[in-house]
């Protein structure tokens, strides 16, 4: 992928800014998401809550299912590939989907290497818990970053932690003497020029969305007020008692995140949210956010 193609991919991801991307498992859910105002859908066979509950190896979704969803909506369609599984990514690119998410929600295929995203023309989304992770993924060719909040829990605490960590580390980099940027880049395994770019911008050079544990309009508005550019919602919509209403509510809260009255309106009469899983109760080997490096 040449520089112009990468810049185009970054611009494509910028077009999703301020919007909500929803996980969907079938055509009906995809249409609900589109009608609710989602800017894109993530096509997958099982939402994170089901992946967590059922266990086993989670792989790329059946391509035929992705094709059916792609045919059913006019908004962009994303799909997940396992960390390091570049052949799954090749298949998804051949399907001509709009974005690939190299996702820790699926079982990693490679415990040493992430996908070299510069070998692809399609934009990639990657998760990050901190600035170092984000910049390593961008150096590999990611056009979009998201938090790695603990998916399938309905608990936003980890996404908040990741965003606050990212914000704090960017502030530290901005205030760093230029001669220390080399040390920062070396210690985080990233190109010096990329670290210098972030120092100058005061933010990541790509969009950074919230993901993981977002279940309510208030969760979405919280992440936007913390500085996220948009929101991914996985299990939070279709594991709730009224998916259609909740989908519309989260879209509204994301758009009007700084208007408490609008967020209040969005929060009324939604029915039951998805059940919440306390992070401390999850066995260490089942924590998804620690996958990747």
From Swiss-Prot:
Record-listed D-ribose 5-phosphate binding positions: 23, 152, 213, 234-235
Domain of life: Bacteria
Pathway(s) per entry: Cofactor biosynthesis; pyridoxal 5'-phosphate biosynthesis
Record-listed E.C. numbers: 4.3.3.6
Gene Ontology terms: biological process: amino acid metabolic process; pyridoxal phosphate biosynthetic process; pyridoxine biosynthetic process
Reaction(s) this enzyme catalyzes, per UniProt: aldehydo-D-ribose 5-phosphate + D-glyceraldehyde 3-phosphate + L-glutamine = pyridoxal 5'-phosphate + L-glutamate + phosphate + 3 H2O + H(+)
Active site, per annotation: 80
KW Transmembrane helix (keyword) present: no
Keywords: Lyase, Pyridoxal phosphate, Schiff base
Residues holding D-glyceraldehyde 3-phosphate: 164
GO MF, any single term: pyridoxal 5'-phosphate synthase (glutamine hydrolysing) activity
Presence of keyword Ion transport: no
Disulfide bonds: none
Family: Belongs to the PdxS/SNZ family.
NCBIfam families for this protein: PRK04180.1, pyridoxal 5'-phosphate synthase lyase subunit PdxS
Record's function text: Catalyzes the formation of pyridoxal 5'-phosphate from ribose 5-phosphate (RBP), glyceraldehyde 3-phosphate (G3P) and ammonia. The ammonia is provided by the PdxT subunit. Can also use ribulose 5-phosphate and dihydroxyacetone phosphate as substrates, resulting from enzyme-catalyzed isomerization of RBP and G3P, respectively.
Assembly and oligomerization: In the presence of PdxT, forms a dodecamer of heterodimers.
HAMAP family: PdxS (MF_01824)
Protein name (database record): Pyridoxal 5'-phosphate synthase subunit PdxS
Organism: Syntrophus aciditrophicus (strain SB)
Top-level taxonomy: Bacteria, Pseudomonadati, Thermodesulfobacteriota, Syntrophia, Syntrophales
């Amino acid at each position: 992928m040449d520089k112009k193609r990468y810049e185009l991919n970054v611009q494509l991801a910028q077009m999703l800014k301020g919007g909500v991307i929803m996980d969907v498992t079938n055509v009906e859910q995809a249409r609900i998401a589109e009608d609710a105002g989602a800017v894109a859908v993530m096509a997958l066979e099982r939402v994170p809550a089901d992946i967590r509950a059922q266990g086993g190896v989670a792989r790329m979704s059946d391509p035929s299912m992705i094709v059916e969803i792609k045919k059913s909506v006019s908004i962009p369609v994303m799909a997940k590939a396992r960390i390091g599984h570049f052949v799954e990514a090749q298949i998804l690119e051949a399907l001509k989907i709009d974005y690939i998410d190299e996702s820790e929600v699926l079982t990693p295929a490679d415990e040493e290497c992430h996908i070299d995203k510069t070998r692809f023309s399609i934009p990639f989304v990657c998760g990050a818990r901190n600035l170092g992770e984000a910049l390593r993924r961008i150096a590999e060719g990611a056009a979009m970053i998201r938090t790695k909040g603990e998916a399938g829990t309905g608990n936003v605490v980890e996404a908040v932690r990741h965003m606050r960590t990212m914000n704090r580390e960017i502030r530290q980099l901005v205030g760093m003497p230029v001669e220390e940027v080399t040390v920062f880049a070396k210690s985080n395994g990233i190109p010096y020029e990329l670290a210098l770019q972030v120092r100058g911008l005061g933010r990541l050079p790509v969009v950074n969305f919230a993901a993981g544990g977002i279940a309510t309009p208030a969760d979405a508005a919280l992440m936007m007020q913390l500085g996220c550019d948009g929101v991914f919602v996985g299990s939070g919509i279709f594991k709730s008692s009224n998916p259609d209403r909740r989908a519309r509510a989260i879209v509204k809260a994301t758009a009007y995140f700084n208007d408490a009255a609008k967020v209040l309106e969005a929060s009324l009469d939604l029915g039951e949210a998805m059940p919440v899983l306390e992070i401390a109760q999850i066995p260490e080997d089942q924590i998804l956010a620690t996958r990747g490096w």
